[in-house]
Amino acid sequence: DFPLLHRASFAVETAAPELLLAVLLCGSLYMPPTDSALSARNLFDLAEELAFRRLAVGLAAAERADGGGGEGPVSCPPRLYETLQAALIVHALQSTMRSSTARRRNRTVRLPALVSAVRVLGLAKTKHAVADLMMMAPEARWAQFVQAETRIRISTWTLLSDCQQSGVFHCPQLMTTLEMTGSLPCLPELWNAASHSELDQVICASGRDCLVRGASIRVAVETLMAENWDGPEAFPVKPLTLPDLQVLVFSIHSSMRNARFASILPAAAPVVARAIDRWQELWDLAARGLTAEELSRRGLVRHSGELCWLARVMLDVSMSEDAERSSAYLQGVAHDSLEELHAFLRVYCSLDD
C-alpha cells in the first residue's frame, strides 16, 4: 500500500541483480497461471539465498568501512539499500508459500536478519531534514529526499513484516513501536514524483510541511493509547492517510500480543481497548469519502477495518477465562501453520455473524 521501490529512479540496467530477481518473481505472482509463471516459484529459494547472503556480506562490509561498528548507526552504501529491498520482497514472497520449513526459516532466520540490519543502519530513526532539503539544489534535493524516504520505507516495511509474522503465527515480535522514531512514509504524490522538478511542484503546492507528517509511528501509537484524548482533529499525524492507519492497527495488534506474552494483558486491556476505539474513529473519518468500490481497489489497506474488528475480538477472547482452552491459536506460541489462525477466524467470525 506504500511502494517499497522508487519507480522514477529504478533502472533495470543498474539495479542490483538480487533486486531484479526479486521484482521479477514478485511479478510472476500476478500473472495468469501459465507454466512459466508457476515454474518461477521454483526460484524462490534461490532468490532468498542470494538476497540474504548479499545482505550479510554488504552489512559486514559497511561495518568494516565504518570502523568496525561502535557508537551510532553504520553508514549505508546505496547498493545495500537495494539488497535490503530485495530481501524484504523475497521475505514477503516466501510467506505466501505452503512449506512449513520455509515459513519457519522466514520467521526464525530471515526476519531477525532484516530487523538487525534496520537497527545497525539506524533506519527506524530516519527523518526528512526539511530545512536542509530546502537549501539544496533541485537535483540534490530530490536525491536526498529519495534516499531518506527509502530508509523510512525499508524500516516501516520491516515493522509490518514483523507484525504480520507475529500475528499469523502467534509469536513474539522482534521490532517495537518504541524504536520507530523516524518519519512516517511520505504522501504518495511526493514518492510518485517523476523528476526533481515535479517533486518541487508538489512541495510548492502542498507546502514544505507535507514532508514532515507531524509525528512518528511511536508518537502516533502513544497518542492512541494515552489516557487523554482530544479527538481526531488533534491527532498529531497530518494528513492522516489510510496506509498510516494500516500501520497503526498492526501496531495495536502487536502491543496487545506483547502484553499477553508478558502476562500483563489484564492491566493493559483498558489501554488497548481505548486505542482500538480511537483508531476506529480515525478510520471512519479517513474512509468516509470513499465508496465501497473505491476502497476495494486500495490493496491490503482495504482490510484495515477488519483488522480493527479482529483486534477487538482477540482482546475479548484473550481476556476470557477459557481463552486457551477454546482456541488452539492462543494455546501455543510460534505455530508453523496457518491452521490455528484459520480455526480461530472460523469460530469467531461465525459467532459474530
Language-model segments: what does each one mean?
Residues 1-3, 42-70, 116-128, 208-353:
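Long, amphipathic alpha-helical regulatory blocks in the mid-to-C-terminal portion
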Residues 15, 78, 150, 298-300, ...:
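Structural signature of alpha-solenoid helical repeat scaffolds
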Residues 17, 21, 84, 152, ...:
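Start-of-helix signal in alpha-solenoid helical-repeat scaffolds, especially tetratricopeptide repeats
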